[in-house]
Amino acid sequence: MSTTSTTPQTAPRRATITDVAREAGTGKTSISRYLNGEMSVLSPDLRARIEAAIARLDYQPNQMARGLKRGRNRLIGMLLADLTNPYTVEVLQGVEAACHALGLMPLICHAANEVEMERRYLQLLTTYRVEGVIVNALGVREETLRPVVGSGIPAVLVDRLVDGLVADMVGLDNRAAAELGTRHLLESGFDEIWFAVQPFEQVSSRQLREAAFREAMGAQAGQAGQAGQVGQGGKGRARGHTLVLNLADTAEVERSLAELDRAIDAATNAGHSGRGGNLANPGGAARPAAPHSRRIALFAANAPVALCLALHLKARYGADWQSRVALLSIDDPDWAELTGVTTIRQPTYEIGYRAVEFLHERIEGVQTAARDCLLPGELIVRASTSR
């Protein structure tokens, strides 16, 4: 019977600036000057010895310590509400590219749509002495950001304004995007349009989209009334509704979707004889809309809402659910192209890149009034709304 004994292995000690100085036969001051690029004060022979010592010892400078000594660490914080949202991931790609180009290092904080977690992360970022903060959060308020901006740390907001906070903001032109989508649905001849949005009381981007939808619907109603016009087939002006989908509460989602189901059935089954009410086809295929039914469309305020609607409609009406109801979404997730859903594509990469550029300018001391950079969305028309 043999036994083996193991001795805990200790990781090799990292070389320090003192080790490099000893190896190069000089003092720590000369090493610091070399690391800081002050080559003019070092002789060619000394520079060569220091370079060789660094290579032999595999010395890696402590960038955080060096940055703190200079008062700069090139670290910026980014507070994100929902990293599972494709929009956030795409914005983050632009952030990372800009950070790489500008020599910054992003510290990502994912709050998972929890307001208390957002507050804690903001407090934590101040202890890391970040040079700036980019905020795309759910419930951040001015008093939450006050410790950050009050300590002289610049902040840039992504897509969402914060009441009472004067700061740069980069994002989609939400009003224009919602108007663009609503006009497309109206011009496509839909008689009934439901704008589906998550709770919007505390999120400015959702507020702007919902308000723009209502205003666009009201404007077409006024224009049609003044001109004495009616919709296609003499059915009258299009009707608009707002449906709140609280994706964080399953019971509330079910109640909201039940309301939507009743509206879809009432609109699309109007011309069918026989039983009314819920006519979802148990065989897995949607019954086509009746010849004299009202054409109904759903306008999702973002990709998570659109996905919730699409999955529900497929489960209820079958794979051919789009023969019964159209779907348009702000955001253009990959699955939208596969299913033929019309979207309004956001310039997500540009939003992230521009946010870092704004923040970098503030870090470097640019003093201007707060800036809003509103970027246009692009309407991508697919089969869902062109049938």
Q: Which positions does each model-derived feature cover?
A:
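Flexible loop/turn connectors
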Residues: 265, 270-387
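Flexible loop/hinge segments that line or gate small-molecule binding clefts
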Residues: 113, 136-180, 200, 304, ...
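An alpha-beta-alpha
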Residues: 179-220, 231-235, 239-242, 371-386
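Short, solvent-exposed amphipathic alpha-helices that sit
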Residues: 49, 87-101, 177-181, 204-222, ...
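Hydrophobic alpha-helical segments within soluble ligand-binding/sensing domains
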Residues: 170-195, 252-263, 346-364
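Structural motif
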Residues: 106-127, 178, 242-271, 282-291, ...
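N-terminal helix-turn-helix DNA-binding module of bacterial transcription factors
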Residues: 1-73
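Amphipathic helical "hinge" segments at domain boundaries
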Residues: 44-48, 57-132, 199, 211-214
